[in-house]
Regions:
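Signature aromatic-anchored transmembrane alpha helix within multi-pass, membrane-resident enzymes
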Residues: 10-18, 223, 227, 289-293, ...
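Specific aromatic-rich, kink-prone transmembrane helix
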Residues: 114-117, 136, 143, 155-172, ...
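Catalytic lumenal/periplasmic loop and adjoining terminal transmembrane helix
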Residues: 30, 234, 346-496, 500-503
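Perimembrane helix-loop-helix junctions
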Residues: 2, 164-185, 196-230, 283-292, ...
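Hydrophobic, aromatic-rich transmembrane alpha-helices
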Residues: 117, 269-295
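Short acidic/glycine- and proline-prone juxtamembrane loop motifs at membrane-interface regions
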Residues: 29, 33, 145-155, 318-319
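Membrane-lumen/periplasm interface segments of specific transmembrane helices
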Residues: 188-189, 196-281, 300, 310-313, ...
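Transmembrane-helix motifs of polytopic, lipid-linked glycan transferases
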Residues: 98, 102-125, 162
Length: 506
């Protein structure tokens, strides 16, 4: 084993990355954020069931159809998986979600391998640096957890790393390098539109290096690949780039509706997500190098910097937005740090200090990995839907008390439900709401909330004395911790009541 690991230094990091991702897939569950479930899983699964949960498709919209502010490329790939599930299984929604997590975990192993290849190309004499990069990408911090969920910001990482690899394979880009870089950047942009900033930021680098043919080649290849990935727009809408235009239009007018922050918000995010004290060393290593850096170094660092500057200037500052470039930042950051450290007389005299800093990092990282692997996001909402699936429910109602968080209907096995948001619909008394359900009575009513949950339940029970209490599903301990760290993440209980003959129907 030792001999094999020495000859194949990528073997052990890949194995560790695989095991940690399988653990995160098997022992975790739920979803991390709104978008990874509702804009991916919920949409794709509903299409496979002959529904259109998010009303993305123009033939299901009333009036003038309007493009949803997302794209079909990645969601379409998940739709094909759900169609495959119908042929081969599994059939239970939770089992399907598990398979999705495993597949995403396997897919993310490419990031580890490509980080190693990029490091080998940028620092060919430092094989230990490339191995260290692979270990960081495989087994540190939140990467095992993030790698198994359906975030587009993570799905675009392997092709983006492929693009960077193509850019650093040689100082004078050859046609093979141009194809690899262009296809990688094009696919990444097709999955996550903002990755196009990488391509834009690459232009001045190649111009400065006078690589005219490479600039044209990468540009044409990337645009061609991206255009092919937008082909579903022609099928669905009858014209190209509809989703892209819808995405730009939505974000130009609704950006202020989302979390904001100062211009240095993402610097703080990087310091946290990379985990101290390594985060300080990696950021210094990535951006301190001067004229001594090789030309292919700037083909990675400048696009990363451009991507970060773009998002720092943008008003909507959600932490996940910068995830696409973080693995590349780790790669060049570690190379730059090792290069600077080896040239520093001060660090030559303080080798033990650096060893202590990295030991501290790995202790913190191991704790983060251990805490995050069993993460089951939005536990109460998911388990409530799984309860309905076990009851073979056809129609249900959700009364949202303290938040407008939608129920993850995918786990219920049905797409027929009624949503009442008490925060915005307070003018409708419970009796009137219940009467509106008579045409298709829900079998269960789910009350979702926290502080005012008991009050809302009491109001509905007074209007419908026949409601029968079934169970209460509490949030997970992890959900409570996340809420405590950042209250913007809602935490709710779900109380389930059977309607039976409780509705005021004639």
């Amino acid at each position: 084993m030792n001999h094999s690991a020495w000859r194949h230094p990528l073997l052990l990091p890949l194995l560790a990355g695989l095991l940690l991702r399988l653990a995160a897939a098997l022992y975790g569950g739920g979803y991390l954020m709104h978008d990874d479930h509702f804009l991916v899983v919920e949409a794709a699964a509903s299409w496979a069931d002959g529904e259109d949960y998010n009303n993305w498709l123009p033939w299901n919209q009333k009036g003038t159809p309007k493009a949803h502010p997302a794209n079909f490329a990645y969601v379409g790939s998940q739709y094909l998986l759900f169609e495959l599930f119908k042929l081969t299984g599994p059939s239970h929604p939770s089992d399907q979600a598990l398979v999705l997590r495993i597949l995403h975990g396997l897919y993310s192993l490419a990031t580890i391998a490509l980080g190693h290849l990029i490091a080998r190309a940028l620092a060919p004499t430092r094989k230990h640096t490339a191995t260290a990069v692979a270990w960081l990408l495989a087994a540190s911090g939140l990467w095992p957890l993030l790698s198994v969920h359906q975030l587009v910001e993570m799905a675009c990482v392997p092709p983006l790393m492929m693009g960077f690899w193509g850019l650093v394979r040689s100082r004078q880009l050859r046609w093979q390098d141009i194809l690899i870089a262009g296809i990688g950047i094009g696919i990444a942009t097709g999955i996550r539109f903002q990755c196009g900033v990488i391509g834009v930021a690459l232009v001045p680098v190649l111009l400065a290096q006078r690589q005219w043919q490479a600039l044209v080649g990468v540009g044409v290849t990337a645009l061609g690949t991206f255009s092919l990935m937008q082909a579903p727009d022609l099928y669905v809408w009858g014209e190209p780039f509809v989703q892209l235009r819808g995405y730009i239009g939505y974000n130009s007018t609704h950006a202020g509706n989302y979390p904001k922050g100062p211009w240095y918000q993402y610097l703080l995010t990087l310091l946290g997500i990379l985990l101290p004290p390594a985060s300080l060393m990696l950021l210094w290593g990535a951006f301190h190098r001067g004229r001594s850096a090789p030309g292919n170094w700037w083909r990675v660092v400048v696009p990363i910097a451009g991507f970060l500057i773009f998002h720092s200037a943008y008003i909507n500052k959600q932490e996940r937005f910068i995830l696409p470039v973080v693995p590349a930042l780790i790669t060049v950051g570690l190379i730059g740090w090792h290069n600077w450290r080896e040239r520093s007389q001060w660090w030559a005299r303080h080798r033990k200090l650096e060893g202590g800093l990295w030991a501290t990092f790995w202790i913190i990282s191991t704790a983060v990995v251990a805490a995050s692997i069993p993460y089951s996001g939005k536990h109460s909402r998911v388990k409530a839907m799984e309860f309905l699936y076990g009851q073979k429910v056809e129609t249900f109602a959700v009364v949202q008390v303290d938040s407008g968080s939608m129920p993850p209907q995918f786990y219920s096995g049905t797409w027929k439900s009624y949503h009442i948001d008490n925060r915005r619909d307070q003018q409708r008394p419970p009796l009137q709401v219940a009467a509106s359900w008579c045409a298709s009575p829900p079998q269960f009513i789910l009350f979702q909330g926290d502080r005012h949950l008991g009050e809302a339940v009491g109001q509905y029970k007074a209007a419908m004395p026949g409601l029968r209490y079934v169970t209460t599903i509490a949030p997970s301990r992890t959900d409570r911790w996340i809420h405590a760290l950042n209250p913007i993440n809602s935490v709710e209980r779900v109380m389930i009541y059977a309607t039976e003959d409780a509705l005021p129907c004639p």
